């Protein structure tokens, strides 16, 4: 029988659940992935079914173990990384949700957020965040105010709330552990990033009882144990859950951005640029967020500056599934290169389908395409879609550079869209940075794997990890300065024209 030990990491994303088996060399042994349903009950609303997420995640965990042909006794530890801000409220006796999960992209609390303008500075100082529908606090409040079953369950003392990591930990441990990690907690608007605890003043502001919230732990410690029967009927192994981090912080760790000033960008459904800023939180002057990156056991927490783009890879999904301009995301590079060769006119697509994230934070912006001419073909729209991902990321890189007072030279990248050579090269040229793509672009899952492994001594220290991450390709800037300035200027004009759209036309 195989006596080797492995780590299984559960990577619960916005559109799919995956489980990955990693070995001691941080190599992927097997992967299982299944998509789950997206619900859009009203304009600007986005929901998931928490039970579907749980069942999907569980089935990938079971099948990835079987694919790797290992038993639960071969699993040293489990890591969890997850879509952040998305919230679930459930009954602790029945284990059933009282409402669908409200997803990070959901904008239903926009108007409520506007009523809190006088609290903006206080909230920012305590949490490092801005008041925005994106974060968990206003979503939890909405469920408590609008869902009778939530109110009834709360009155009965049976209600629990949490982000997706908490929901999965609770289910995996058979309801024994209600916990979250510092990186996920720091995305709720309820967590004080200086005291590293839930903040009573913020709980009062958002009218959320502390009793329903999870215990906050470090990102790398023993949380509890996976119920043996979840692996298989005959399993008896006690496998600990030892690494937990929100997806973007997990990717920062997985890219080994361990020193202040190191930057990574993840190209997923959205785009997320994070910079390690060390053990002291810096507040951005450019509307970036300050967030907890991770905390290793009893060590001091590490902080990050973060810029979030809501729609990145999701824009490519839209031209594939909504507009049907392509059959497969992989085709988009071909069409973008085709349009580049024609170089007749520049089209800009601003994919603010759910508003704009950093550094604009405009909930009322909506998507638009600019520069259309009679000669515009589908390849121009496809090229503009890919370039929109780059322009949005460039906005974040420039804001970060300004906040820390020095030019960013290198950006490490990961996520699905890094497979696009067009996006990677254009990013390097537009931002004037060297873009480094690692061999293993699964940095998000790798981060939680490293966190889980460190907690149980699977890897002994950070030095050992540094030998495990290998570079696939480095992209260097190719466009001249004048061309870049012209392209970026056009993007800036296009973005501004989408501001406040929903408010001005009042299309609710």
Curated annotation (Swiss-Prot):
Positions that bind sn-glycerol 3-phosphate: 14, 84-85, 134, 247
Pathway: Polyol metabolism; glycerol degradation via glycerol kinase pathway; sn-glycerol 3-phosphate from glycerol: step 1/1
NCBIfam families assigned: glycerol_kin, PRK00047.1
GO CC, any one term: cytosol
Matches recorded under PANTHER family: GLYCEROL KINASE, SUGAR KINASE
Ranges in a coiled coil: none
GO biological process, one term: glycerol metabolic process
Cysteine disulfide links: none
Regulation: Inhibited by fructose 1,6-bisphosphate (FBP).
Catalytic activity of the protein: glycerol + ATP = sn-glycerol 3-phosphate + ADP + H(+)
Protein name (database record): Glycerol kinase
Gene: glpK
Domain of life, per lineage: Bacteria
């Amino acid at each position: 029988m195989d006596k080797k030990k492995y780590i299984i990491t559960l990577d619960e994303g916005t559109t799919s659940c995956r489980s990955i088996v990693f070995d001691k060399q941080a190599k992927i042994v097997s992967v299982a992935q299944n998509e789950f349903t997206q619900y859009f009950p009203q304009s600007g609303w986005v929901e998931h079914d928490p039970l579907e997420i749980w069942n999907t995640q569980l089935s990938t965990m079971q099948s990835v173990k079987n694919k790797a042909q290992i038993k639960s006794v071969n699993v040293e530890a489990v890591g969890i990384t997850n879509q952040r801000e998305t919230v679930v409220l459930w009954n602790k006796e029945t284990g059933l949700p009282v409402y669908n999960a409200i997803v990070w992209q959901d904008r239903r609390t926009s108007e409520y957020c506007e009523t809190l303008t006088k609290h903006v500075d206080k909230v920012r100082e305590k949490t490092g965040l801005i008041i925005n529908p994106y974060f968990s606090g206003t979503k939890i409040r909405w469920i408590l105010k609008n869902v009778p079953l939530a109110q009834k369950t709360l009155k009965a003392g049976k209600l629990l709330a949490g982000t997706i990591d908490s929901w999965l930990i609770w289910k995996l441990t058979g309801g024994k552990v209600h916990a979250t990690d510092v990186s996920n907690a720091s995305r709720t608007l309820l967590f004080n990033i200086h005291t590293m605890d839930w903040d009573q003043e913020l709980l009062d502001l958002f009218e959320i009882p502390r009793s329903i919230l999870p215990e906050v732990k470090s990102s790398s410690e023993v949380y509890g144990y996976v119920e043996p029967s979840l692996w298989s009927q005959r399993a008896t192994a006690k496998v600990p859950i030892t690494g937990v981090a929100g997806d973007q912080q997990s990717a920062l760790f997985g890219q080994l951005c361990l020193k202040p000033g190191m930057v990574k960008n993840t190209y997923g459904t959205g785009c997320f640029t994070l910079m390690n800023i060390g053990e002291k939180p810096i507040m951005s002057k450019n509307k970036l967020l300050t967030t907890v990156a991770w905390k290793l056991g009893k060590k001091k927490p590490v902080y990050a500056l973060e810029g979030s783009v809501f729609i990145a890879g999701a824009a490519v999904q839209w031209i594939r599934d909504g507009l049907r301009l392509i059959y497969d995301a992989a085709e988009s590079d071909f069409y973008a290169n085709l349009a580049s060769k024609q170089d007749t006119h520049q089209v800009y697509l601003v994919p603010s389908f759910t508003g704009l994230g950093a550094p604009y934070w405009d909930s009322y912006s909506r998507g638009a395409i600019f520069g259309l001419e009679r000669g515009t073909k589908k390849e121009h729209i496809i090229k503009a879609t890919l370039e929109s991902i780059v322009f949005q990321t460039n906005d974040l890189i420039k804001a970060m550079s300004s906040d820390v007072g020095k030019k960013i030279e290198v950006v490490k990248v990961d996520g699905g869209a890094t497979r696009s050579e067009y996006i990677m090269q254009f990013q390097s040229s537009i931002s004037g940075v060297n873009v480094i793509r690692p061999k293993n672009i699964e940095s998000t899952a790798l981060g939680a794997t490293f966190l889980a492994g460190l907690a149980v001594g699977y890897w002994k220290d950070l030095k050992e990890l540094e030998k495990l991450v290998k570079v696939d390709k480095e992209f260097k800037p190719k466009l001249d300065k004048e061309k870049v300035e012209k392209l970026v200027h056009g993007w800036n004009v296009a973005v501004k024209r989408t501001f406040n759209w929903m408010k001005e036309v009042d299309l609710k």
